[in-house]
Amino acid sequence: MSRWLALLPALALVALTVLFVGYALRHDPHVRPAALVGKAAPQTALRPLGGGVPRIPTGTVRGPILVNFFGSWCAPCAEEAPALMALKSEGVTIVGVAYKDQDPNTQTYLRTYGDPYQAILTDPTGRAGVEWGISGVPETFAIDASGRIVAKRSEPLTPQDAQSLLESLAR
């Protein structure tokens, strides 16, 4: 009996290790809980790129559209630029939100990598990012015709990711 009691801590350690490794192998670090999926897009008034009065409340946006948070300082954002340009050429409406960025830097970024956006809004303080629940950039939201967020992607879009977002809009 005492031999089994002596082995109990070792068995518990092995069991915990198996659970931890199992979780780590199944967990995709790019998939984050998306609290807003299934809910209306947040009501956030953002200033257009280049200045002006905040005039475009994102919560009034009706889809199907993609809302893409990006930054000129973000290397992964540059990686996804070709996928966004391909979506634009297919007629997909994309609204860009320049996250924690300055207008001149955003304009240079768009000249360098292309401008796939129908509208470009700015979030220099990151407040809209908080309201949308982003954890970094790039992040892309698919919004259906009723203004409801139907999908979210928290990494650079690939052509396959873009297709998946478009399929979620078609449902």
Model-identified regions with their sequence ranges:
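Generic structural signal for well-ordered beta-strand positions
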Residues: P54-P57, V150
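Structural microenvironment flanking redox-active thiols in thiol-disulfide oxidoreductases
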Residues: A78-G114, P124-V130
